[in-house]
């Protein structure tokens, strides 16, 4: 599945009558399949916390479904407003272990286009080192730009 198909799928999910969590799960699965990634999750960001709202079924719920906004790779993405790509999480002290099998991770902030505030994150994980290329990062940043609608609808 190509990234244009994924973007259309995200837009379709956002326009559907599904609830926010159901939309997040559907979108996470679309992204996971497009890049052959092992796990994808979507998180809401508040002033204090990062909170999981939906993820792919396998390997399951994240070990940290909510954590302080200043922690982990997600905290770094929120603080900078930029994607964080780590191709060996065992070498990065910011990494919060969600799954023992994760070796590479990308966190992409979802930004409110009106205020520039980070309102969510797209978390993509792989069981392989060096799994993410710049093309992956660019595609995921494109997905995050469309994802704003998931958070706008919730009043985030």
Residue ranges and their predicted role:
Residues 44-98:
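Regulatory sensory and allosteric helical modules in signal-transduction proteins
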Residues 16-53:
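Helix-loop-beta substructure at the N-terminus of cytosolic sensory domains
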Residues 39, 107, 121:
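Short hydrophobic/aromatic beta-strand element in the GNAT-like acyltransferase core
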Residues 9-17, 25-34, 76, 146, ...:
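Amphipathic alpha-helical regulatory segments at dimerization interfaces
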Residues 104-114:
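A short, aliphatic-rich beta-strand micro-motif
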Residues 3-7, 11, 120, 125-156:
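Juxtadomain coupling helices with adjacent low-complexity linkers
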Residues 34, 97-103:
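Short loop/turn motifs at secondary-structure junctions and domain boundaries
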């Amino acid at each position: 599945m190509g990234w244009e198909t994924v973007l259309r799928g995200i837009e379709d999910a956002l326009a559907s009558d599904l609830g926010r969590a159901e939309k997040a799960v559907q979108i996470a699965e679309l992204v996971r399949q497009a890049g052959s990634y092992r796990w994808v999750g979507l998180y809401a960001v508040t002033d204090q916390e990062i909170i999981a709202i939906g993820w792919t079924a396998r390997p399951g719920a994240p070990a940290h479904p909510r954590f302080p906004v200043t922690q982990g790779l997600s905290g770094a993405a929120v603080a900078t407003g930029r994607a964080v790509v780590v191709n060996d999480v065992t070498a990065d002290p910011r990494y919060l272990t969600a799954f023992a099998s994760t070796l590479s991770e990308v966190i992409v902030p979802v930004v409110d286009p009106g205020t520039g505030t980070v309102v969510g994150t797209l978390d993509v994980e792989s069981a392989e080192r060096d799994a993410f290329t710049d093309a992956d990062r660019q595609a995921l940043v494109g997905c995050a730009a469309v994802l704003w609608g998931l958070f706008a609808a919730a009043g985030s």
